[in-house]
Amino acid sequence: QRQMCIRDSSSSVDLTSNEPWIVARNTAVILLLYGCGLRISEALSIKYNDMPLTNNLKVKGKGDKFRIIPILQIARESVENYLKLLPFTLDGNDNIFRGVRGGSLNPRSIQLIMKLLREKLGLASNATPHSLRHSFATHLLTSGADLRSIQELLGHTSLSTTQIYTSVDSAHLMDVYSKTHPKAKSKNSLN
């Protein structure tokens, strides 16, 4: 499976509509899924009360537990751009992401957008909105983040759940081992 990166996700979502606000919405949602590791339900439940965004985002996760996560500047700017273009008026407790008729955006819409992205980018059939969350976790781990921090960012109660998300290749594990284990640094000497 080819993992998506921020470049793929931000430059490719415009294939789904000619309406600028819909293009902006799709871009913002995809960037939140990948750039913040959000579940689709978490992204779609962001409230107008939470605006304007700062460098952090308060997310209501599973079990109605809240967590604070950092938000990438590109994701924040995408949400702000979407809100400027949105043709509907929002009240404080409204979800910010809206469907074509102004109601709350249905998760199925995002799944369909991902289907179009898969076709355009030649991604594997298992490239789904949820796989963006997996890519987020895997990219953090391969860039040096520790599992415990990734667990907090994803909102997992169990570290074993986080481990499932972080598909680590054996070459990366051996590299980390050889660079960090004191005896591995000294040419596998046990002295």
Question: Would you name each region that the model predicts?
Answer:
Residues 3, 7-191:
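Conserved catalytic core of the tyrosine transesterase superfamily
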